Structures are given as structure tokens and as C-alpha cells.
Swiss-Prot record:
Gene3D superfamilies reported for this sequence: P-loop containing nucleotide triphosphate hydrolases
Keyword annotations from UniProtKB, A to Z: ATP-binding, Cytoplasm, Kinase, Nucleotide-binding, Transferase
Gene Ontology CC annotation, any one: cytoplasm
Binding site for ATP: G7, V8, A9, A10, S11, G12, K13, S14, S15
InterPro entries: Cytidylate_kin, Cytidylate_kinase_dom, P-loop_NTPase
The name this protein goes by in its record: Cytidylate kinase
Domain of life: Bacteria
Any GO BP: pyrimidine nucleotide metabolic process
């Protein structure tokens, strides 16, 4: 069984996917962390974010490893854990450019498709491109203001600044963030985390519940 959870930036994908995975007792996989880790490595090496000819060699020189756990994901570059550094503003601002590179997307997709089911996969285009035949697909959305207010609780930045960055991120990600035709679309704005998880669990096919 494969469950995909897509959605716009800061819509709660990671928290929801982790909760669903825990409820089902299966691993949780975050594709976005791999893109963020690639972005961080490029920034630290002062590489252009839109040039795969320099970025891919950097990824091969510092192989990334995604540790998929029901309670969350950890990302490693060798013996160095990157997880705590992957949600900084500079990574937020650069990850769309890296994720738009076909070469990088192919690299991430290959790692994800090699994983054995069952699992809950969270990230952009999980249900449309990476796992189009997933057993169940969900797409999370919320207004930029709601998402900014939530993210402001996680980092020392003001809501208007975060909201402006999210609006720009939405603009850049528009093509990648469209829901699959057969996805369940959920507005997480008026819902608490546990409510969103409950909606998803209730909508799963009976054989995978």
C-alpha cells in the first residue's frame, strides 16, 4: 500500500504524513527533505542553484541518505545530520529552483521508487508523477496567511515576511503543485492536525485501513 500526500508549501504535509504513517504503522517518506538537502549542499558550496552540471557532482561527492521513520525523517550527508538545517529561510528560497531541475528530480525519484511498500510518501508531485498508481492520494491546501501563521510558530520570523515568501513560492511551484485528478483535496485551514489525519484515515480504501 502506498499513500501519497501532496500540497502547497507549509500546508502541513510533513506533520500529516507522519501522523498517518504512525496510525498505519508504516514508514513515512519525505521527498522534500531530499530536495532541501541538495539545496543546502549547493548553497554551502556557493554553487548556482539552476545548474545541474555543478550540482549533481556535489551530490555524488556528498551522498545523501534519507532515514525514513514513522515519526519523521532524518537526512544525512555521510556522518553529518542535516535535518535541523533544512527549513531555514535561505533553503526555503532556493529549493524551488533545485526541485525544478529534471536531473535532480530524476535523482530523487529513483531513490523514492526503490523503496519497498508499504509507506506514506509526502512531497510535491508524489501522486501525479512519482507514484501515479498509489492506492490513495491526498492534496493539502490552505491560504498563504494561515500557512504563514503556522510557520511563524516554528521560526523567529514575522508573519508578513513568511507570507510574502510563501506567495512567491506558490507562484514558482504552480505547475508542480497541482493535485492529481483522483486526489482527495483537503483545506487544512479550519482543521486541527488530528482532524486532517482523521479525514485521511477515514478516506483510505478498506483493504489498507
Amino acid at each position: 500500500m502506498i499513500v501519497t500526500i501532496d500540497g502547497v508549501a507549509a500546508s502541513g504535509k510533513s506533520s500529516v504524513a507522519s501522523g498517518v504513517a504512525r496510525a498505519l504503522g508504516v514508514p513515512y517518506v519525505s521527498s522534500g527533505l531530499l530536495y532541501r538537502a541538495a539545496t543546502l549542499l549547493a548553497l554551502e558550496a556557493d554553487l548556482p542553484l539552476d545548474d545541474p552540471t555543478t550540482l549533481l557532482p556535489q551530490l555524488h561527492a556528498h551522498p545523501l541518505r534519507l532515514e525514513a521513520l514513522p515519526e519523521g525523517n532524518r537526512v544525512w550527508a555521510g556522518e553529518r545530520e542535516l535535518t535541523a538545517e533544512l527549513h531555514s529561510t535561505r533553503v526555503d528560497q532556493g529549493v524551488s529552483a533545485v526541485a525544478a531541475l529534471p536531473e535532480v528530480r530524476a535523482w530523487v525519484d529513483a531513490q523514492l521508487r526503490a523503496l519497498p511498500a508499504p509507506f506514506v510518501a509526502e512531497g510535491r508531485d508524489m501522486g501525479t508523477h512519482v507514484f501515479p498508481h498509489a492506492d490513495a492520494k491526498f492534496y493539502l491546501t490552505a491560504s498563504p496567511r494561515v500557512r504563514a501563521e503556522r510557520r511563524a510558530q516554528e521560526r523567529p520570523e514575522d508573519v508578513p515576511t513568511i507570507e510574502a515568501a510563501l506567495i512567491e513560492r506558490d507562484r514558482r511551484d504552480r505547475l508542480q503543485s497541482a493535485p492529481a485528478p483522483d486526489a482527495h483535496v483537503i483545506d487544512t485551514g479550519p482543521l486541527a492536525l488530528e482532524d486532517v489525519i482523521g479525514v485521511i484515515l477515514a478516506a483510505l480504501p478498506a483493504r489498507s485501513a
